[in-house]
Amino acid sequence: MENRRSSGGSGWWVCVLPLFTKDGPAYFLHSSSDDVSAWRQWPLYIALLIVAVCAVLVSWLSPGGCAWAGRHKRGRVAIPGPKGWPIIGSLMDMSVGLPHRKLESLARLHGAKQLMSFSLGCTPAVITSDPEVARELLTSPHFANRPLKQSAQQLLFGRAIGFAPNGGYWRLLRRIASAHLFAPRRIAAHEAGRQADVVAMLDDIQKEYHSKGVVRVRRHLQGAALNNIMGSVFGRRFDMSHENEEVKKLREMVDEGFQLLGAFNWADHLPWLRPLDPLRIHARCARLVPRVTTFVSNIIEQHRREEQRRESGDQCDFVDVLLSLQGEDKLDEEDMIAVLWEMIFRGTDTTALLTEWTMAELVLHPEAQKKAQAELDAVVGHDRSVKDSDIPKLPYIQAVVKEALRMHPPGPLLSWARLSTEDVNMGDGMCVPAGTTAMVNMWSITHDPNIWESPYEFRPERFVVFEGGEEVDVRGNDLRLAPFGAGRRVCPGKALGLATVNLWVAKLLHHFEWLPHAEHPVDLSEVLKLSCEMARPLHCVPVTRVPFAKFSD
């Protein structure tokens, strides 16, 4: 029985091969009974192949492609969208180039700005470029879950805030983070740490300029961002100007984690590819997880040995908070590792890249830079440095950051999608079936000329009320500009991120004038990884305008 199954399943090529020999069909006149049996099964293989091809083609003809076959019947009107390629759908559009721009073009082509269907292999997906539909997708309880990526499942054990399914455990994590890490009083309590990080960054920038005549800005921003989150989460900071072995290993782990979480993995959408691991996602995650576990576990154990640190005061870090939890709130070690490591991934990438985009625009627009510096001189002067309390008095600085967020949203597709938990009627007769991956093209919304005047121009004044602009809340209340998402799954660290970026931009502009470098012109080309970053890192010349060494921050 076993041998017969083997010859029947793979013996078709034995029948076909003789047709191409000099004996041709005469081969079968002298063939064994097993070969003749294989030949008789050949029509069955042809029939099955024809049926499979027809099934693929029929499903492919559905709007949105293969994964949408039969799903449009749940609504009165089919959701328009591209067919893509048979079997793989629109996977190429998502994995090559800039998917937010490609999807925006496809939505225009299919008249599907409100809602567009498309297939990612076996995954049915929808995307919107409309603020009102975006509000429904982001705030409806029917879209409160996230599709789980293989890399997130392995690196974060599916237990971190970003990917935990909607329910009691997720609500517990959200409550803990909101109360003990991202609450306004906690953000204010850690101002001294943020000031120390930015002063160290300014010093390193000045040293690099004096030694090389040009500064590669991103690495300084990433080092400061890593120290900022390490200080508030783990209670540790590093000297980024002199990388020891521990700092080097930490940077390597963070960089590898960024790459893995940001990689578009075909195996997430074509399950039969998972055992093959064509992009080596599984293998790389398997190598990284033990290193991450060891690193975080050592810090947790160190905190356990220093019990006197765990006090109720504002200066305790997030590890102290997690260790102090009791009863039903207490997390096991694996959950703690997932939550703490997620803070590193989510807390460093966006802050550094948004600051880099902001500074790049200011180098390209010296008139905006001078205007921001004039505001700083009027409010802060030259006799002290910028503090958190100054930021509300610096509306133009805040407008500059908002405009950078509008032009270069760190997550142009809001980083991680949503997953519908049941059929949802979206209006106009369209229905999003349960189990559909739902996305918002925030880049398309922030570059829509029907929403924003001259959307491709850098104009911070559009957000300055006393200059005829409009006050726009970027924290998720106004879906015309919601770079941190909205609803239950809004980024919990949005307030900390904005406070950090506003302070950094203000201090960078206060202490230096930023000029372009002749050999490294500013290039705003994009590359989408975990976040959308500058394809060519920013290089520029910082000229001291207010010496920072004399200030004690």
UniProtKB/Swiss-Prot annotation:
Signal peptide: none annotated. Its EC number is 1.14.-.-. InterPro entries: Cyt_P450, Cyt_P450_CS, Cyt_P450_E_grp-I, Cyt_P450_sf, Cytochrome_P450_78A. It comes from the Eukaryota. One of its GO terms (molecular function) is monooxygenase activity. Pfam families: p450 (PF00067). Heme binds at residue 491. It is an enzyme of class 1 (oxidoreductase). PROSITE patterns: CYTOCHROME_P450 (PS00086). Its cofactor is heme. Keywords: Heme, Iron, Metal-binding, Monooxygenase, Oxidoreductase. The keyword Ribonucleoprotein does not apply. Belongs to the cytochrome P450 family. This is Cytochrome P450 78A4. It comes from Pinus radiata. The gene is CYP78A4.
